[in-house]
Amino acid sequence: MDATSKRLTRTTVASQVRDFIVMEIAQGRLPLGAPVREMEIAAQLGTSQTPVREAFRELAALGLLESRIHVGTRVRQLAEKDLVEAVPIRSALEGIAGRLAANNYHKHAEEVRGSFEAMKEVAEGGDRRVFAAASTTFHRSVVRAAENASLLRAWNALGIEVMTILAMASSDIPLDDAAESHRPIVDALEAGDPELAEHALTHHVAAYLPATAHSNGGVDAAVQAS
């Protein structure tokens, strides 16, 4: 295995560790303020501490974890507030992306439509974490279709997949309905209507997570899906 393959494998494991921790937070098994220890997570998942450390760094950058000298790593107390504050930013960014993507859709139709169909297929499996990844892939395909590098960088910086995992873990909306809620976005893009695409994305994102609150120590998201 060459260096690139080793790096890819480690990155994949780190992403799995990240998703596991996010689910633990979302479902209340790691309440806000709770300590999170590298050795314990590594032992629990049967992996080395290296991918766990990488996952910790990513989640700290997203504001879900915080590390302090002589204290260790904990679930950040303001994680929910940060998520709520990120929603209108994401809504605005994706609205702009929709407007731009509508004019470029003919070049990206296969990717956007393909990711939408893949999301619907994944929904049938009932795995919310897998669905969150598929939903993120769809939204990323729309932002990519905007063909604006600055917009894509800003969108990526929000940690969309983590936001989506948190929302889906705490929501009881059927995944088939969650997938179908993306159809107006696809319809607007296929119609080549910038204003309609902007409205569809802005409304979709703003509606799915208007607020979060404690629920048995976890994160209770609104019932709309990302």
Curated annotation (Swiss-Prot):
- Which superkingdom, per the lineage? Bacteria
Q: Which pathway is recorded for this entry? A: Carbohydrate metabolism; D-xylose degradation [regulation]
SMART domains (UniProt xref): FCD (SM00895), HTH_GNTR (SM00345)
**Keywords in alphabetical order:** DNA-binding, Plasmid, Repressor, Transcription, Transcription regulation
InterPro entries, alphabetically?
GntR_C, TF_FadR/GntR_C, Tscrpt_reg_HTH_GntR, WH-like_DNA-bd_sf, WH_DNA-bd_sf
Sequence ranges assigned to domain HTH gntR-type in this UniProt record = 11-78
Task: Tell me yes or no: is Transcription regulation among this UniProt entry's keywords.
Answer: yes
A molecular function (GO) term: DNA binding
Q: Which residues bind DNA?
A: 38-57
Function according to Swiss-Prot or TrEMBL: Transcriptional regulator involved in the regulation of the entire oxidative D-xylose degradation pathway via repression of the corresponding genes.
Q: What is the protein's given name? A: Probable D-xylose utilization operon transcriptional repressor
Q: Identify the species of origin.
A: Paenarthrobacter nicotinovorans
